[in-house]
Every structure is written in C-alpha cells, then in structure tokens.
C-alpha cells in the first residue's frame, strides 16, 4: 500500500511538470534576437569550421507582440526565420503577432501542428521584412477523438488507470478478507454443531427433553443451550404457511416433525415477545401450542428468527372448518378445549414459581390449531400482554403490530379500552372467542343442515375491512354475526348460541369470563357424553 501511495505522489509531480511546460507562452518558444549588424556575422578563421547557423546571413523581420527589448521601429534581426502567428484564446478571440525566430529549432517551430485544445497557425519566411504581409488563418474546428495524442489527455488516461487499479486492489482485499471471515465462521459453526450434537444423547426424543425440563428445571422450557442445539439441527422440509409475520415450515429433528416459524427481520419484536411468553414459568398446557425452541440463525449478511413448536398437520381451525363439518360432539370438543387454553392463559398462578395472567390480543380461527385428537391449542402469542399482580403493572409489548380488525372488540375499535388496566384486555379476548364459537357452530350439522364456512361479519364488511368499516357495524349499529333459525331448534346449538351471545356483549362487564365459559362447556360436554 505504501508503494501505491509513493507511485501516486510521483504521478502528481509529473503532472505538475507537464502542466507547467504546457502553460508556457510563445515568447519562451519562439526566441527572437536583438538588433545586430552585418559586421556582427562571424567570419571563418584559418583552419576553423563554423556551425551552419554562424554562416547564415542575418534577416530583418517585422515584430509585433514578440519584439526583443532593443527592437527599433518594430524590427528585429535573426539568422533564422521571420514568422507570423495567429492564435485563438480560451474566450474565442484571435490575436495576430509576428517576430524573429532563432535558427535553433526554427524548422520544427515552423512546422507547428495544430492541437485540439489550442487553435493556432504559424507561417515562416526568409527575406527581409517578409512577415509583415503574412496573413495566416486559423485551422478549421475539428472534433477529434478522445485520445488525440496530447499530453493532457495522456495524463487524464494515466490518472484514470491508476484509480481503476487502486479500486480493483481495494475491492480484492475486501472480498478476500470477507471470504476468509466466512470460511472461519462456517468452520466454527460446524465445530459448534458437532459439540452440540454430543450434548444431547442419541435416542432422546423431544418429549423426553421437555418432560425432563418440567420435572427438574424451572418450568420455563428447555435450557437455552439445548434450544440452540435443536435449532441448528433442524432440517427444513416444506413450507406450510405464510403470513404477515413470516413463514411456517414443516421441519424435522432426528426424524420428529416440528413446526418452524421463520419471522421476517422486521418482525423481531413479535418473535421476541412470543418467545418470552412461551418461556414464561408454568406456561405449558395441552391446549396451548407446545413450545420447543427459539434461536437467531445467520451470519453477518443474513439473519433468521426461528420459533420451533409442535407440528399439527390438521392446520388451523380456519383451514379445518373450511373443509370439514362437525357433529355436536366434535363441536363441543373443539369449543371446550379452546376455552381450556384461553382459561389457562387468563389465569394467574400464585407461588414461588407462579404464572402471570396473560391476554392474547389476537384471537381468531387462524391462530387456533387442530390437534390429532380433535382438540384445539392456542397459538401466535406475539401480541400477548402480561399482568404482574405484585406491581399491578400491565406488561405491553413494544410492537407496532396490531390485532385483526375483524375480531376486534367494540372498545378496541372505538379506542375506549383502558390500556393501563389488565381486565379490559381479558374481556376483549372473550369477545373474539365468541366470534370463534360462531364459526364453529355454523359447521355443525343438525337435521342434515349445515352452513358453508364464513368469517364473522362476512356479509356486512369487505374482505379486508378497515377500522371505519368495523366501527360502523360493531360500535354504531351494534350488529353481530347472523344466526340461522335452525340453531334454536337444536338443544346443543341453542345453548351454544346463548353462550356466544354472552361473550360478544357490547358492554365488556356483561361478558363471561374464560373460567365461566369453560365450566359451562364442561357441563355440556358431560351431558353429551363427549370424550375429551
């Protein structure tokens, strides 16, 4: 690098000298002589040979603009040539000058070739005062090629070449350094992976690891090192879903299927919050999506936020209801299991390792998954809020994301919800849960009749409703999803209708609690002899 800087400095010095030579005027190139007489001409001595310029006769020339200091009547004496020259300056003005030219170099000067950047013409003669009547004319304007052979363009070309070479050198050094760093990181990653694989004994299943963590750990999930190990060893199989937060993939860990939620980097707040909620002490419940691990994967150039959970091949309640119908037992099993999960979220567990009360804030059929046994589990806790009863504080996530407008409670839509108290968040969840029960009930067959699957308010608002659309329907008109007349003729659906109506009441204080919903559905399950 020092050699490069030295070369650039030398180049700068050369360019300075070149520009200095180019900047000299014609007075330094076309040297005239002073006044001389014929007697001043040298005579050859015996045995002495004179130079050619000393044998030439002297001429008297007319001078204008190039006169020596001892010129008389604008004349000068030379043994070379008389000349006249016309030049054009930078402003486009022409000047005609004349004078005497020394013998040395006169042949070269008289053959002066025009330059693209300086228009001029010189004419020479060799008789007394012959240049007084010379009228040289400027050469025509010629737009020459970029490389016209001039020193100035040569300097520019050299400078450009030096800059390009320097850029190539710097780029090569940077790329090589980055490549070495990448190779080093990859090697370190592979070594860590090998060490982590040895950390989890062969034959240990996810269920074994989770059971061990619950019995001997803090109750907040697997140790972080184990989570990172599992995340590194996941094999992605296929994408099964995509949403506003990111993508969901079906992956495998040692042959076991897992769901991998890959968050967009812009949704880091949601990833962090959901990971934090899942790792809350005593959070694990059969009707809450089973959390396995979370990790940030990537190198310096890319980052992936992983959330690894149990995989449920039946998909979401939304997907399930679109293609499947229910009998009363299946309906009650879905509703009751979902209520159990919501009740666990809302309930605070006291003790040395207690669990805070949690409100979901984005309950909808797409955020409830269907397990193999036909029960539900609640997922997507990226917007959840926690309540700390010791400090009486509501822990609200620092997240720009908001819930789904179609499922928002009236107090959320009209912005009357008190954000500093926890109970309003609980009641907003209950409103959303009532809409989910409505979605389930529509797909329940009674008397051979069933409605097609629809989202709540499907016939009242657009497919992607705005706040204003929902506020007009829910808050101003106080409308609720339509109910089929057949519901009143069936004992089970009639009870479900009463339940959902008490869930979506306009006044939050009039709504049922999750515990009351759970107990009511438990009685219905018992009366129908449903096996949970």
From Swiss-Prot:
<keyword id="KW-0472">Membrane</keyword>
<dbReference type="GO" id="GO:0061626">
    <property type="term" value="P:pharyngeal arch artery morphogenesis"/>
</dbReference>
<dbReference type="GO" id="GO:0005524">
    <property type="term" value="F:ATP binding"/>
</dbReference>
<dbReference type="GO" id="GO:0021983">
    <property type="term" value="P:pituitary gland development"/>
</dbReference>
<dbReference type="GO" id="GO:0003183">
    <property type="term" value="P:mitral valve morphogenesis"/>
</dbReference>
<dbReference type="GO" id="GO:0042803">
    <property type="term" value="F:protein homodimerization activity"/>
</dbReference>
<dbReference type="GO" id="GO:0001707">
    <property type="term" value="P:mesoderm formation"/>
</dbReference>
<dbReference type="GO" id="GO:0030509">
    <property type="term" value="P:BMP signaling pathway"/>
</dbReference>
<dbReference type="GO" id="GO:0001701">
    <property type="term" value="P:in utero embryonic development"/>
</dbReference>
<keyword id="KW-0675">Receptor</keyword>
<comment type="function">
    <text>On ligand binding, forms a receptor complex consisting of two type II and two type I transmembrane serine/threonine kinases. Type II receptors phosphorylate and activate type I receptors which autophosphorylate, then bind and activate SMAD transcriptional regulators. Receptor for BMP2, BMP4, GDF5 and GDF6. Positively regulates chondrocyte differentiation through GDF5 interaction. Mediates induction of adipogenesis by GDF6. May promote the expression of HAMP, potentially via its interaction with BMP2.</text>
</comment>
<dbReference type="GO" id="GO:0003148">
    <property type="term" value="P:outflow tract septum morphogenesis"/>
</dbReference>
<dbReference type="GO" id="GO:0007398">
    <property type="term" value="P:ectoderm development"/>
</dbReference>
<dbReference type="GO" id="GO:0046872">
    <property type="term" value="F:metal ion binding"/>
</dbReference>
<feature type="disulfide bond">
    <location>
        <begin position="110"/>
        <end position="124"/>
    </location>
</feature>
<feature type="domain" description="Protein kinase">
    <location>
        <begin position="234"/>
        <end position="525"/>
    </location>
</feature>
<feature type="binding site">
    <location>
        <position position="261"/>
    </location>
    <ligand>
        <name>ATP</name>
    </ligand>
</feature>
<dbReference type="GO" id="GO:0009952">
    <property type="term" value="P:anterior/posterior pattern specification"/>
</dbReference>
<feature type="disulfide bond">
    <location>
        <begin position="125"/>
        <end position="130"/>
    </location>
</feature>
<dbReference type="GO" id="GO:0060914">
    <property type="term" value="P:heart formation"/>
</dbReference>
<dbReference type="GO" id="GO:0071773">
    <property type="term" value="P:cellular response to BMP stimulus"/>
</dbReference>
<dbReference type="GO" id="GO:0030425">
    <property type="term" value="C:dendrite"/>
</dbReference>
<dbReference type="GO" id="GO:0048598">
    <property type="term" value="P:embryonic morphogenesis"/>
</dbReference>
<feature type="transmembrane region" description="Helical">
    <location>
        <begin position="153"/>
        <end position="176"/>
    </location>
</feature>
<dbReference type="GO" id="GO:0003186">
    <property type="term" value="P:tricuspid valve morphogenesis"/>
</dbReference>
<dbReference type="GO" id="GO:0035137">
    <property type="term" value="P:hindlimb morphogenesis"/>
</dbReference>
<dbReference type="GO" id="GO:0050673">
    <property type="term" value="P:epithelial cell proliferation"/>
</dbReference>
<feature type="signal peptide">
    <location>
        <begin position="1"/>
        <end position="23"/>
    </location>
</feature>
<dbReference type="GO" id="GO:0050768">
    <property type="term" value="P:negative regulation of neurogenesis"/>
</dbReference>
<dbReference type="GO" id="GO:0003151">
    <property type="term" value="P:outflow tract morphogenesis"/>
</dbReference>
<dbReference type="GO" id="GO:0060043">
    <property type="term" value="P:regulation of cardiac muscle cell proliferation"/>
</dbReference>
<feature type="active site" description="Proton acceptor">
    <location>
        <position position="362"/>
    </location>
</feature>
<protein>
    <recommendedName>
        <fullName>Bone morphogenetic protein receptor type-1A</fullName>
        <ecNumber>2.7.11.30</ecNumber>
    </recommendedName>
</protein>
<keyword id="KW-0812">Transmembrane</keyword>
<dbReference type="GO" id="GO:0048368">
    <property type="term" value="P:lateral mesoderm development"/>
</dbReference>
<dbReference type="GO" id="GO:0030324">
    <property type="term" value="P:lung development"/>
</dbReference>
<feature type="region of interest" description="Mediates specificity for BMP ligand">
    <location>
        <begin position="107"/>
        <end position="109"/>
    </location>
</feature>
<dbReference type="GO" id="GO:0030501">
    <property type="term" value="P:positive regulation of bone mineralization"/>
</dbReference>
<dbReference type="Pfam" id="PF08515">
    <property type="entry name" value="TGF_beta_GS"/>
</dbReference>
<dbReference type="InterPro" id="IPR008271">
    <property type="entry name" value="Ser/Thr_kinase_AS"/>
</dbReference>
<dbReference type="GO" id="GO:0001880">
    <property type="term" value="P:Mullerian duct regression"/>
</dbReference>
<feature type="disulfide bond">
    <location>
        <begin position="63"/>
        <end position="67"/>
    </location>
</feature>
